[in-house]
Design a protein with these regions (language model features):
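Short loop/turn segments that flank or connect secondary-structure elements
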Residues: 1-206
Length: 206
């Protein structure tokens, strides 16, 4: 490879007219992203904008991604929740997810590919051999973090759900008999089921 790589890229930042990185279908987030934001002290500001995708079929994966919001200029289209449409810029640019740092270069485990052909920054600027190596290393790191997150999330989710179930069960056990009956009645009504005979007789006697 020559000193000047075939791959060249320069982010146009707020001069970009396609918003390709902001409107792409998914802006992935890794567990390492969360750890980095925690260490930087940004986690509480960023966390409200992060969602977890729940698998709809056995073939689907768990994954973290940024939340979406409709574009003011096109209500039928959505963008990353951290996209500031007025400024045409990312609100967390200097601490953005690793998937944004590598965009549009991506590593799929075998080769490097362009994740978007709509990004106008591709073909702009000159990328030295050293800069290309750094970009590829970062793309490989993003791939590694993405795979590790996909592998770990089912277990993390299961642990969290188990903890919530245990806490709910303990809270129910600590309820008084009267409060427990009231809770049962609320659950029964929410399901549209007829009240129990005991509850009905109590209501009639009252």
């Amino acid at each position: 490879m020559s000193e000047k790589s075939k791959y060249s890229f320069k982010c146009l930042e707020n001069k970009c007219d396609t918003k390709a990185c902001h409107i792409r279908p998914r802006v992935g987030v890794t567990i390492s992203d969360l750890a980095r934001w925690m260490n930087q002290g940004y986690i509480m500001n960023i966390l409200p904008g992060i969602t977890i995708h729940m698998p709809e079929t056995e073939k689907d994966d768990f994954y973290f991604e940024t939340a979406r919001k409709p574009l003011e200029s096109d209500s039928e289209s959505t963008a990353c929740v951290f996209y500031n449409e007025q400024a045409n810029a990312c609100e967390i640019r200097y601490s953005r997810p690793i998937s944004c740092q590598t965009f549009p270069l991506e590593f799929n485990g075998e080769k490097y590919v362009l994740s978007s052909k709509d990004c106008p920054g591709v073909g702009h600027g000159d990328v030295s051999k050293e800069a290309l190596q750094d970009a590829r290393k970062l793309a490989e790191q993003e791939y590694k973090e993405r795979i590790e997150t996909t592998a770990a999330l089912p277990a993390v989710y299961s642990v969290m759900m188990s903890q919530m179930i245990r806490q709910s069960a303990e809270a129910m056990q600590n309820l008084s008999e009267e409060d427990r009956k009231k809770m049962d009645e609320i659950i029964t009504k929410s399901r549209g089921e007829p009240a129990s005979e005991e509850s009905s007789s109590n209501d009639q006697s009252g």
